[in-house]
């Protein structure tokens, strides 16, 4: 009897406090774009309008939706894909025990029930990538959906994709995903890495991490599983993921050859790409820029090659003394990608793993190759983003962004941090968020989160929450710095609520309402404290905002401007000082 994963096995979260799921109708039939609407209380009888924010949580936070993990999410994009008339269903490759890293399938592995689903691919001679449509002047349903989410015109979305400045990762076999866009002229996005390892985690835990990450604001998920049940874990995640899912296919390919890098072949890797494309993976990290001639340059580094995918390919190249087969077969990879609309995330296999190695010859040599590969992918109308570092001190961060834009012709940059110092294990979500905010401001389109467990262990769901929130802060700070037209609205609303002592509105407007309320209630748990004009930091007599209110009230009572009120009050105090004998201490 095959086991299953059910909603009862994981902790599912409802909508955040003070929020409700709302939908904006598109022009296309059945198109409903989700938003999160945050209610606000009145100020002295004057209504404060609700604030609508971008929502990545999927149907899990819709009270009308019944979660059935074994059935997967609904698939609204399926009809859009079929409606274009350029795809066909086919049998697909046979799923084998080796796909899960075993020789014989285990009865204890919870296989996803809907295994009779037929994958889609482009018809002979067709190209189903969003870039191909965009370059042919077509505004797809996915582009309109994204435009509503971002608050821009659909034509702007089409043009950014056509020019290669943005990608819309949307594999035709992942119809459950709600379309989103990654590009420097849109909201800065956040990716959350999940996935098992050889020593930790189960399928249920990884599905739970996915739902947690998207609830807290992850725009995409990467399944970086390296343990057993790789295929099955990915199937459960994709079928239940409302956001795009990325992978590093070389990890699974390595499992298929028993973890021996030198036994990897193009045929094994190609088979893995097709397997994952049929499942619905939206973007592949492919380390095609790790060339044989670059590997010796890393020998003088402090920390060598720190990318798992990069080190695997380097080991293969050195053993065979041949060029990286991902590079030599790159055009063939493009042919696969455009059949399913899988986007490239060109991997930075030679990224710096320490401050000492930042911006070195190996890193920027690989970047030059990624620029070359970007042009090849674009020749096939395949969408591309570029992965970036890594460990970079603050004064060297801007150079990374400038070089990427120049060398890779403006393709979206997707960076891991970067970490700005190496001395804070346990706090690397903070060291990296500093760099993430900076590089997001300079133009990075998506930030890959770092959790407190970075360099220490596999993150659990609480670490995922911590990492996502930390990176949402960095991404939002970057949006503010870039002058995104709607970014300041939530800040202004929260600041107004703070000044007016609307405590619940403060909590609800924050990125993590539950944490904000928890910290407030540690010292002032009573319900009356939710309307008090002070908190436990300053108390009632030293609250600067309460004093500001007193000044304004004084000005109002005396028919004065606030500055005049302060001057008048100072004069009154001066007279009082003289009348009491001009003594400093009584």
UniProtKB/Swiss-Prot annotation:
Gene Ontology biological process terms from the UniProt entry: thiamine biosynthetic process; thiamine diphosphate biosynthetic process
This protein's encoding gene: thiC
Positions with biased composition (Basic and acidic residues): 22-39
UniProt cross-references to HAMAP family, sorted A to Z: ThiC
Role summary: Catalyzes the synthesis of the hydroxymethylpyrimidine phosphate (HMP-P) moiety of thiamine from aminoimidazole ribotide (AIR) in a radical S-adenosyl-L-methionine (SAM)-dependent reaction.
Pfam family, one: ThiC_Rad_SAM
Cofactor note: Binds 1 [4Fe-4S] cluster per subunit. The cluster is coordinated with 3 cysteines and an exchangeable S-adenosyl-L-methionine.
Reactions catalysed, as given in the entry: 5-amino-1-(5-phospho-beta-D-ribosyl)imidazole + S-adenosyl-L-methionine = 4-amino-2-methyl-5-(phosphooxymethyl)pyrimidine + CO + 5'-deoxyadenosine + formate + L-methionine + 3 H(+)
PANTHER family the UniProt entry points to: PHOSPHOMETHYLPYRIMIDINE SYNTHASE, CHLOROPLASTIC, THIAMINE BIOSYNTHESIS PROTEIN THIC
Protein name from the UniProt record: Phosphomethylpyrimidine synthase
Protein EC: 4.1.99.17
Keyword DNA repair: no
GO molecular function ontology, one term from the record: zinc ion binding
Domain of life: Bacteria
Keywords: 4Fe-4S, Iron, Iron-sulfur, Lyase, Metal-binding, S-adenosyl-L-methionine, Thiamine biosynthesis, Zinc
NCBIfam families hit by this protein: PRK09284.1, PRK13352.1, thiC
Annotated binding of Zn(2+), by residue: 391, 455
Region described as Disordered: 1-58
Family: Belongs to the ThiC family.
Cofactor(s) in the UniProt record: [4Fe-4S] cluster
Gene3D superfamilies: 6.10.250.620, Radical SAM ThiC family, central domain (3.20.20.540)
Pathway: Cofactor biosynthesis; thiamine diphosphate biosynthesis
Binding site for substrate: 193, 222, 251, 287, 307-309, 348-351, 387, 414
């Amino acid at each position: 009897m095959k086991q299953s994963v059910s909603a009862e096995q994981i902790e599912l979260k409802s909508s955040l406090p003070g929020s409700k799921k709302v939908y904006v109708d598109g022009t296309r039939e059945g198109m409903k774009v989700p938003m999160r609407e945050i209610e606000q209380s009145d100020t002295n009888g004057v209504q404060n309008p609700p604030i609508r924010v971008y929502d990545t949580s999927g149907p899990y936070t819709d009270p009308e939706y019944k979660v059935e993990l074994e059935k997967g999410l609904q698939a609204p994009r399926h009809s859009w894909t079929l409606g274009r008339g350029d795809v066909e269903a086919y049998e697909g490759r046979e799923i084998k025990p080796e796909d899960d890293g075993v020789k014989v399938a285990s009865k204890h592995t919870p296989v996803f029930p809907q295994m009779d689903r037929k994958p889609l691919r482009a018809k002979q001679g067709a190209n189903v990538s969003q870039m191909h449509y965009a370059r042919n002047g077509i505004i797809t349903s996915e582009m309109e959906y994204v435009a509503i989410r971002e608050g821009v015109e659909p034509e702007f979305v089409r043009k950014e994709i056509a020019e290669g400045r943005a990608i819309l990762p949307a594999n035709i076999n992942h119809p459950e995903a709600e379309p989103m866009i990654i590009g420097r002229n849109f909201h800065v996005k956040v990716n959350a890495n999940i996935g098992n390892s050889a020593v930790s985690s189960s399928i249920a835990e990884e599905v739970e991490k996915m739902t947690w990450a998207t609830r807290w604001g992850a725009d995409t998920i990467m399944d970086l599983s390296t343990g057993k049940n790789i295929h099955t874990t990915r199937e459960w995640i994709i079928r239940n993921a409302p956001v795009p899912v990325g992978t590093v296919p070389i990890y699974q390919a390595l499992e298929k050859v028993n973890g021996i890098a030198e036994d990897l072949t193009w045929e094994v890797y190609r088979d893995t790409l097709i397997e994952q494309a049929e499942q619905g993976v939206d973007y592949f990290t492919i380390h095609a820029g790790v060339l044989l001639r670059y590997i010796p340059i890393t020998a003088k580094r402090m920390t060598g090659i720190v990318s798992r995918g990069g080190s695997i390919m380097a080991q293969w190249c050195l053993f065979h003394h041949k060029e990286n087969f991902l590079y030599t077969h790159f055009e063939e990879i493009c042919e696969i990608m455009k059949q399913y609309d899988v986007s490239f995330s060109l991997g930075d296999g030679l990224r710096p793993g320490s401050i000492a190695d930042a911006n070195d010859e190996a890193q920027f040599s690989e970047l030059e190759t990624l620029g070359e590969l970007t042009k090849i992918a674009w020749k096939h109308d395949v969408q591309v983003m570029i992965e970036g570092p890594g460990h970079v001190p603050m004064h060297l961060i801007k150079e990374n962004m400038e070089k990427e834009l120049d060398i890779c012709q403006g393709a979206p940059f997707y960076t891991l941090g970067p970490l700005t110092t190496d001395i804070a294990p346990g706090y690397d979500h903070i060291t990296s968020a500093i760099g993430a905010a900076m590089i997001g401001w300079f133009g990075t389109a998506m930030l890959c989160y770092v959790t407190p467990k970075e360099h220490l262990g596999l993150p659990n769901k609480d670490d995922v929450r911590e990492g996502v929130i930390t990176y949402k802060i960095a991404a939002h700070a970057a949006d503010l710095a870039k002058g995104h037209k709607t970014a300041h609205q939530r800040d202004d609303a929260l600041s107004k609520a703070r000044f007016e002592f609307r405590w619940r509105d403060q909590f609800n407007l924050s990125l993590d309402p539950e944490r904000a309320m928890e910290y407030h209630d540690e010292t002032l748990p009573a319900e009356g404290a939710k309307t008090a004009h002070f908190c436990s930091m300053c108390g009632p007599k030293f609250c600067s905002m309460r004093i500001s209110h007193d000044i304004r009230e004084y000005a109002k009572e005396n028919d004065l401007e606030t500055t005049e009120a302060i001057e008048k009050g100072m004069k009154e105090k001066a007279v009082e000082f003289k009348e009491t004998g001009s003594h400093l201490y009584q």
